[in-house]
Amino acid sequence: MISGNITAKAEGKTFALSEGGYLYCPPGSLMTFVNAQAEDSQIFLYKRRYVPVEGYAPWLVSGNASELERIHYEGMDDVILLDFLPKELGFDMNMHILSFAPGASHGYIETHVQEHGAYILSGQGVYNLDNNWIPVKKEITSLWALVLYRLVMA
């Protein structure tokens, strides 16, 4: 949830989701949701075809980013990682929030083949894409989405 409040249902369970809330539904699960307030709610919805690993399966996961363990990304004090999904072979992906303090960055330029992207939750910064520095900021920039970034304005 980016803002607002919704009521979501999946696998016979009901979830009240507010800012920072999330719900992962495994393959074959039906999810429904309705706005639970008079004002608009803003959600980030991501759907992709599941790639199974024999002998493993994902399960329904729900929570709130405010309750997740804050991990110092690659040992850096100025970059915090919040992982939404378990690090289990049944999950063929992850969603997470990276929070960058002013002046912080990855320790290297990312080069990998995984599907990757960003939705800017707050702040502004620059993103190196194919050796081009692209200005990014909240609500204006959306690189093909799989990773959520929180950039703190200086």
Where are the regions that the model predicts?
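Conserved short histidine dyad/triad with adjacent acidic residue
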Residues: 14, 83, 96-112, 146
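Long compositionally biased, domain-poor regions of proteins
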Residues: 7-9, 32-35, 101-102, 124-128, ...
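Conserved hydrophobic/aromatic beta-strand scaffold that supports enzyme active sites
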Residues: 14, 22-24, 45, 95-99, ...
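A short beta-strand-loop-beta hairpin characteristic of the jelly-roll/cupin
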Residues: 1-21, 111-138, 148
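A short, N-terminal "cap"/entry segment at the start of jelly-roll beta-barrel domains
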Residues: 38-93
